[in-house]
Design a protein with these regions (language model features):
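Short, aromatic/basic amphipathic alpha-helical patches
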Residues: 85-97
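Short beta-alpha junction loops
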Residues: 75-83, 106-108
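Conserved beta-strand segments of alpha/beta enzyme cores
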Residues: 100-102
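Structural beta-sheet core signal
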Residues: 44, 73-76
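Arginine/glycine-rich "motif VI" loop of SF2 helicases in the C-terminal RecA-like domain
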Residues: 63-72, 96
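Active-site metal-binding core of divalent-cation-utilizing nuclease and nuclease-like domains
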Residues: 1-44, 50-59, 65-66, 86-88, ...
Length: 129
């Protein structure tokens, strides 16, 4: 599964936010836009896979926070069960920049999506059952 898939699962099923929101900004005479992986009422969350391409996560989270006025967060998707060089670098940079850093297991997200329909029913033993 790719970053976009993990972001959609986390954002909609766990964080209660909106995935892939767009925000515009101007640079000189040009108009540009960014996409935020997950946006909640209080946070902009940059979802990153544990690989080299995630090294720009801190910058992306900070710029999204600048545009929205919300708290920046990095959510690292752990696919191999270990803390590697990229997670170490990103976590250190996030701490230096005062950006929240969170980790979540990729397999957990997949299982959460696969069983989400089960959480749409009332719990056994709930009043009236």
């Amino acid at each position: 599964m790719n970053e976009l898939g993990f972001a959609a699962i986390f954002c909609t099923l766990i964080a209660g936010g909106e995935a892939e929101t767009q925000h515009g900004y101007s640079a000189g005479y040009d108009l540009h836009r960014i996409r935020v992986d997950c946006e909640t009422e209080a946070e902009v969350i940059e979802v990153a896979l544990d690989k080299r391409g995630a090294l720009d996560s801190v910058q992306q989270a900070l710029f999204a926070a600048h545009l929205t006025g919300k708290a920046p967060v990095i959510l690292m998707i752990d696919r191999d069960g270990r803390t590697g060089p990229y997670e170490t670098r990103i976590k250190a940079a996030a701490q230096m920049a005062n950006v929240a850093y969170r980790e979540i297991d990729a397999d957990f997200l997949i299982r959460w999506q696969m069983t989400s329909y089960l959480r749409n029913y009332p719990a056994v033993g709930a009043p009236g059952l």
